[in-house]
């Protein structure tokens, strides 16, 4: 891939060698994160984000971050209607994509012993908000009602291009849970 002189200058200012591999850092002994983070996975319904093909991506499906005082923050990356192999499911069917997206987020939460009652915020990206917002709001309201959510999470809806043209909706979420909660697989109790 070709880099411009300006791009190389910015990379060098960050201590990244423009000619080296993507992970090459010229500053040995760089500090680690001050707060431990653990990747969240739900392989029964979602592939690892880094396994997308044909293009590689650089993000995690979610992170588990201890906040102290027995609280844990779950940050779930934008999630859409994809299967365990990373393939889009329900192309062209907004409502079915919305239900699959909610299913995928539910499995990510369950992998950490969390539920939708732990969600404090969502950000919802809709490809065509004028066309699909009615269906979006109907499905979300039906789901939240079925889950018994009261209060409902804080939320923002944004019209946005999503990473693939056949994906019509993507949702990211933030949850807070108590450390050691029943069901938190492999976590401190």
Where are these regions (language model features)?
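N-terminal presequence-like segments and the immediate start of the first folded domain
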Residues: 1-103, 107-120, 126-189
